């Protein structure tokens, strides 16, 4: 709108000169000719201007152009305004719109207000009718237009006029709020009562291209034109509003910046008045800090070199911040070796026992490691790696060791790390470079001898950005980590005093070179008895504290804890058990706050369904009896042991073996070995049977769960033997062990977990490989005392104990080489 106002105040000469059309007024457009016709009027050219009928306009012209204009109009002071559409490049031809308006000169006065300017005249003009130009003619050296009047359709009712005028006025007032110095024009628009007059006043202020204004002029209906103008005004109002809002925000931001600058200048003046000004340049401050830090020589030289670079940087230079961050990192790191406190073995034992129940072998190994440290008094030696299922206390053991040694505790999770730079850091040439997690951990510790737990090191993966496990080799190797090189620091850092502890769920995902540098300590699954003690001594107390309760508010009975362990959790650790206890605590908290129940609130086994819902886990129980072809085996899983039923049936066929239940290759091979042993060892027993005309189908239930491993060998053998001899096996008997083709029973792993699972499921007798009998030392006494264990060396012993079969001695054929050669052709 403001630009249109400025254009309105331009003289006609200035307007023509500004838009480059003065020289084109005397040009012969291609459509001109010298034919005379009636209804002709001279043409007045006003570039970049579209006017509506009923428009009043004032022009300031110098004397020459005033004379030209007066010669152009007819005797009635009428002329036709046409607006050039485009200028064809190269030939100077001008193309005009076909529709224009008739202009009438109302008055002409000389402008005498400014005597310093050249002589000018003020012309008052009135736009009359809209016309269609048929031809453009040249007559007496001037251009004329042959035209016809285009009547406008004005069928507006009084109500429509009132409504349209109201909408125009309201929109104009809204726009005027955003723009300064528009009161004069706003009052002029509001003062018009006729819709066409109002449109004529608003039209010059529309911020739309010339061709769009021409389209509005060419509309026949005044009503449609008014509606379109209102729509354009509303769009213009929204656009101006957005611009003003952005300008307001920008202005506010600039004001805040100016305010902050002003306050800083004022502070500087105040400090100068109080002699508080610190004119010490940054590089001098850093030099003093580096000197006071007494860094190692190599590190000090590197830091001073960076300070020298800082001196050359200009103020607010991007490189300056990079150097400052580097120097701050150097100065925040601990460089001087701490004197390690004397290791109190008695205190360490007490700390471990207070924080963790059970884990006897693990605690013994940790204490042995600490005693070596106490005697050696220099490097820590081997790096400990705790391996075990989730929730068995691997990470918390590291925290207990830190407390026992009175050292800082730092934990870094490496799960999901697939970039070597996460360990070694990024080079400072990269934008946003940072040191690696090891150096950041040391900065956090503040000392050179923390207990540093590297959590989930088996969860690291290799990617295009390198292999982080390879970077850990230098960190965890006692022969190398006294000069660990971080890409960000670019100076060696001594990690030899750090007590590194790693944790992992599985050894399979740890590369051999890294595993070779670690002292592996395996943590087994907790037994139900151990879980019960942990819940009593640790979990319930922690949950009560977390929920703002005390032992006087909530009691959980012994049977309820057992039920939680057996029927609501199925895990190797105790995290799930703690979640269930927390759910009980939330329930009781609500009862106390809302219902004001009597305290202590006692939760027994019968209340668990109302609090926790249906049982969430189920353990298989042995049946009263097994049919022939069904035998109970023992299995190891990441969450502990379990019993495993193996089933077999005979089918008509050709002595083929069919296996189902998602069995792995090793387990399939064990079944084939079992079948071969049955054929060789039971040949005498089966000589009268039709076993050779039968297929054997073996299935292991829980078909959705993959199963593999050699420990089901004896169970598969016994299952087939039970089937073909039609002899059932005692349902309270279970077994585990690998078999060889020679009929040997070989040792397997996971004996502790398997035996505990057997006891939980009601098994009374377990057949074990003879070499695994020593592993029963790890089984809790309360479990061993309820069961009978029988050592097995051969499959013959297994079949005798399970089925009562006495097989003949397995003797090799006594045939000499000479006898074989005699019958060989």
Swiss-Prot record:
Q: Which PANTHER family match?
A: ATP DEPENDENT LON PROTEASE FAMILY MEMBER
Domain Lon N-terminal residue range list: 41-237
Query: Which Gene3D superfamilies does the record associate with it?
Result: 1.10.8.60, 1.20.5.5270, 1.20.58.1480, 3.30.230.10, LON domain-like (2.30.130.40), P-loop containing nucleotide triphosphate hydrolases (3.40.50.300)
Q: Which reaction does it catalyse?
A: Hydrolysis of proteins in presence of ATP
What is this protein's name? Lon protease
* Expression triggers: By heat shock.
Species name: Methanosphaera stadtmanae (strain ATCC 43021 / DSM 3091 / JCM 11832 / MCB-3)
What does the record note on quaternary structure? Homohexamer. Organized in a ring with a central cavity.
Tell me the superkingdom of the source: Archaea
- Compartments (UniProt record): Cytoplasm
Key word NADP present: no
Leading EC class: hydrolase
Q: Name one GO cellular component term.
A: cytoplasm
Assigned keywords, A-Z: ATP-binding, Cytoplasm, Hydrolase, Nucleotide-binding, Protease, Serine protease, Stress response
- Its biological function? ATP-dependent serine protease that mediates the selective degradation of mutant and abnormal proteins as well as certain short-lived regulatory proteins. Required for cellular homeostasis and for survival from DNA damage and developmental changes induced by stress. Degrades polypeptides processively to yield small peptide fragments that are 5 to 10 amino acids long. Binds to DNA in a double-stranded, site-specific manner.
User: What GO MF terms are annotated?
Assistant: ATP binding; ATP hydrolysis activity; ATP-dependent peptidase activity; sequence-specific DNA binding; serine-type endopeptidase activity
The gene that this protein is the product of is lon
PROSITE patterns, from UniProt?
Answer: LON_N, LON_PROTEOLYTIC, LON_SER
The family this protein is said to belong to: Belongs to the peptidase S16 family.
Per UniProt, ATP binds at 388-395
Q: Principal localization?
A: cytoplasm
Q: Which biological process, per GO, is one annotated for this protein?
A: protein quality control for misfolded or incompletely synthesized proteins
Residue ranges of domain Lon proteolytic in the record: 625-805
Which residue ranges does UniProt annotate as crossing the membrane? Answer: none
Quote the Pfam families the UniProt record gives: AAA (PF00004), Lon_C (PF05362), Lon_lid (PF22667), LON_substr_bdg (PF02190)
HAMAP family, alphabetized: lon_bact
Give the NCBIfam families listed for this entry.
lon (TIGR00763)
């Amino acid at each position: 709108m403001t630009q249109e106002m400025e254009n309105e105040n331009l003289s006609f000469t200035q307007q023509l000169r500004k838009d480059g059309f003065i020289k084109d007024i005397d040009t012969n457009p291609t459509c001109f000719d010298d034919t005379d016709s009636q209804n002709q009027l001279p043409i007045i050219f006003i570039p970049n201007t579209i006017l509506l009928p009923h428009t009043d306009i004032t022009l300031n012209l110098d004397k020459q152009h005033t004379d030209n204009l007066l010669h152009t109009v007819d005797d009635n002071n009428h002329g036709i305004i046409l607006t050039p559409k485009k200028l064809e490049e190269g030939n100077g031809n001008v193309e005009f719109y076909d529709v224009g308006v008739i202009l009438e000169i109302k008055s002409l006065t000389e402008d005498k207000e400014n005597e310093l300017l050249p002589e000018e005249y003020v012309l008052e003009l009135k736009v009359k009718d809209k016309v269609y130009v048929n031809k453009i003619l040249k007559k007496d050296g001037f251009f004329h237009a042959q035209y016809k009047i285009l009547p406008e359709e004005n069928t507006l009712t009084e109500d429509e006029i009132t409504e349209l005028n109201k909408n125009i006025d309201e929109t104009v007032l809204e726009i005027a709020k955003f723009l300064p110095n528009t009161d004069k024009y706003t009052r002029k628009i509001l003062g018009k009562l006729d819709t066409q007059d109002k449109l004529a006043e608003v039209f010059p202020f529309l911020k739309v291209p010339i061709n769009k204004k021409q389209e509005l002029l060419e509309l026949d209906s005044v009503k449609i034109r008014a509606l379109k103008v209102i729509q354009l005004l509303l769009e213009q109002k929204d656009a101006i509003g957005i611009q003003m809002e952005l300008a307001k925000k920008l202005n506010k931001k600039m004001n805040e910046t100016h305010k902050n600058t002003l306050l800083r200048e004022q502070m500087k003046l105040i400090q100068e008045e109080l002699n508080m000004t610190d004119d010490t340049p940054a590089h001098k401050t850093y030099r003093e800090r580096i000197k006071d830090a007494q860094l190692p020589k190599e590190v000090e030289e590197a830091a001073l070199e960076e300070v020298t670079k800082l001196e050359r940087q200009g103020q607010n230079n991007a490189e300056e911040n990079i150097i400052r961050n580097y120097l701050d990192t150097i100065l925040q790191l601990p460089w001087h070796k701490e004197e390690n406190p004397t290791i109190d073995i008695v205190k360490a034992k007490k700390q471990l026992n207070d924080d963790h129940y059970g884990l006897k072998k693990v605690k013994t190994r940790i204490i042995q490691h600490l005693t070596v440290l106490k005697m050696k008094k220099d490097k820590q030696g081997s790096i400990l790696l705790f391996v075990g299922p989730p929730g068995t206390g691997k990470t918390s053991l590291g925290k207990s060791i830190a407390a026992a040694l009175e050292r800082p505790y730092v934990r870094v999770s490496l799960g999901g790390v697939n970039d070597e730079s996460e360990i070694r850091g990024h080079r400072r040439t990269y934008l946003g470079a940072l040191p690696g997690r090891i150096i950041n951990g040391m900065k956090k510790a503040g000392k050179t001898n923390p207990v540093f737990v590297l959590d989930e090191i088996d969860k690291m993966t290799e990617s295009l950005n390198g292999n982080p496990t390879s970077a850990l080799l230098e960190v965890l190797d006692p022969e190398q980590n006294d000069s660990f090189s971080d890409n960000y620091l670019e100076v060696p850092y001594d990690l030899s005093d750090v007590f590194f502890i790693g944790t992992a769920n599985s050894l399979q995902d740890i590369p051999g070179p890294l595993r070779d540098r670690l002292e592996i300590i395996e943590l087994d699954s907790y037994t139900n008895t151990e879980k019960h003690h942990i819940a009593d001594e640790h979990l319930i107390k922690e949950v009560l504290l977390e929920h703002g309760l005390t032992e006087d508010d909530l009691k959980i009975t012994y049977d309820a804890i057992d039920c939680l362990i057996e029927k609501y959790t199925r895990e190797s650790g105790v995290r799930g058990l703690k979640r269930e206890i927390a759910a009980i605590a939330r329930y009781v908290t609500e009862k106390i706050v809302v219902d004001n129940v009597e305290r202590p609130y006692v939760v027994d086994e019968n209340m668990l369904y109302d609090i926790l819902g249906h049982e969430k886990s189920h353990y298989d129980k042995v049946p009263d009896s097994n049919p022939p072809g069904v035998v109970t085996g023992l299995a190891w899983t990441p969450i502990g042991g379990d019993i495993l039923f193996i089933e077999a049936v005979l089918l008509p066929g050709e002595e083929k073996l069919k296996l189902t239940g998602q069995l792995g290759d090793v387990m399939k091979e064990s079944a084939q070995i079992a079948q071969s042993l049955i054929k060789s060892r039971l040949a005498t027993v089966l000589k009268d049977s039709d076993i050779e005309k039968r297929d054997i189908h073996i299935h292991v239930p829980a078909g959705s769960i993959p199963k593999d491993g050699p420990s089901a060998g004896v169970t598969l053998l016994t299952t087939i033997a039970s089937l073909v001899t039609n002899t059932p096996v005692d349902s309270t008997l279970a077994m585990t062990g690998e078999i060889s083709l020679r009929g040997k029973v070989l040792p397997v792993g996971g004996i502790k977990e398997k035996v505990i699972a057997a006891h939980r499921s009601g098994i009374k007798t377990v057949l074990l490989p003879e070499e695994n009998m020593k592993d029963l030392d790890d089984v809790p006494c309360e479990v061993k005392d309820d069961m009978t264990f029988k050592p097995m060396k051969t499959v013959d012993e297994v079949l005798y104990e399970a089925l009562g079969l006495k097989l003949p001695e397995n003797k090799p054929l006594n045939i000499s080489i000479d006898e074989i050669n005699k019958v060989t052709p």
